[in-house]
């Protein structure tokens, strides 16, 4: 994946005396590319990491870019203009952090979209790593509070001028590129959670159930997937796929549409049919969840990459309970974000 170090990096220039307001001086940005990924253990990517997450909050009509406004938040403690974000709490994923912190700071409910990347900068004796998404405001109301006393909704060019920090400006510029090619469909492509060992299962493999960890993964997928406001759920035939998204279906109050074309067997025996079924989900528009197996997922994504505008040249990963957030415009893949696990990052 682009801009994703595979080993712990040293804190950039950390003197032990730097504050949040010094982040431009020694900060780094990892915002390049429409292919983004979160490491399996993001807290170990840098030394003494403080993890945080947030979003570029926006409102307006993406089909009319001139109507888009973004939220600039004023923090009285720092007397600065910045983006909504906050630190990870125990027992939550980065996606959950982004949604919770936005609600706490601004009062707004959001629907997350594209992962923009991350910024990295030293604060005191730690390395602060902040992941940013785009986040469409879908409800709620701002009430001034101790953390944020004012919010200004501005067109992007005015927001860029108001922002205090260059790092935040670069996040905004990345969001602007995403707004210029708006998503008209998004698929949350989930691999089923962990199931009982195949070698110790004597029955029909389609009936092999989730194990204890798999059941926890399926429960933790609910807040993660809900952050993107899915409208419908599809699943391959195996029960481990259906059971992975069953808690989400209960939360949404909807049925899971089961189709054999989303499974590994279809990818082997009827690749054309499997591609057609996935294309139907794209053409339905909006946001959908598709739960599948580990064999078909890399194949479908590679096919989408070849057909779209997003080249993916490296190995396509699909850990159990992982999520690929796939973004489409006019039926073509324009963005892909890999979230390797729904489990807490701390």
Can you describe what each PLM-predicted range is?
Residues 65-109, 201-208, 213:
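Conserved Nudix-box catalytic region and its N-terminal flanking loop in Nudix hydrolases
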Residues 275-334:
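Active-site-adjacent alpha-helix immediately C-terminal to a catalytic or transition-state-stabilizing loop
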Residues 86, 97, 184-269, 298, ...:
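Active-site-proximal alpha-helix that buttresses catalytic centers in soluble enzyme cores
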């Amino acid at each position: 994946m682009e801009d994703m170090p595979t080993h712990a990096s040293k804190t950039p220039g950390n003197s032990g005396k730097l504050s949040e307001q010094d982040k431009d001086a020694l900060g780094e940005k990892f915002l390049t590319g429409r292919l983004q990924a979160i490491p399996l253990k993001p807290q170990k990517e840098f030394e003494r990491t403080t993890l945080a997450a947030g979003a570029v909050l926006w409102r307006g009509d993406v089909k009319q870019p001139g109507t888009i406004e973004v939220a600039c938040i004023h923090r009285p403690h720092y007397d600065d203009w910045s983006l909504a974000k906050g630190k990870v709490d125990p027992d939550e994923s980065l996606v959950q952090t982004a949604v919770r912190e936005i609600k706490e700071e601004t009062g707004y409910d959001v629907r997350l979209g594209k992962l923009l990347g991350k910024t990295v900068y030293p604060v005191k004796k730690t390395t602060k790593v902040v992941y940013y998404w785009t986040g469409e405001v879908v409800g709620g109301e701002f009430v001034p509070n101790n953390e944020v006393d004012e919010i200004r909704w501005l067109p992007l060019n005015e927001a860029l001028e108001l922002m205090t920090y260059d790092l935040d400006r670069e996040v905004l510029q990345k969001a602007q590129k995403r707004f210029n090619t708006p998503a008209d469909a998004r698929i949350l492509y989930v691999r089923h959670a962990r199931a009982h060992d195949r070698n110790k299962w004597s029955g029909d493999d389609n009936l092999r159930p989730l194990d204890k960890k798999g059941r926890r993964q399926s429960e933790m997928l609910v807040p993660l997937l809900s952050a993107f406001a899915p409208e419908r759920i599809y699943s391959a035939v195996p029960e481990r796929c259906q059971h992975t998204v069953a808690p989400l279906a209960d939360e949404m109050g909807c049925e899971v549409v089961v189709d054999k074309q989303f499974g590994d067997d279809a990818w082997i025996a009827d690749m054309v049919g499997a591609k057609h079924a996935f294309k139907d989900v794209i053409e339905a528009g909006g946001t959908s969840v598709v739960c599948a197996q580990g064999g078909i997922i890399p194949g479908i994504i590679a096919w989408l990459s070849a057909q779209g505008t997003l080249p993916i040249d490296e190995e396509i990963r699909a850990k159990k309970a992982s999520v690929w957030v796939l973004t489409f415009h006019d039926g073509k893949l324009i963005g892909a974000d890999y979230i390797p696990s729904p489990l807490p990052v701390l």
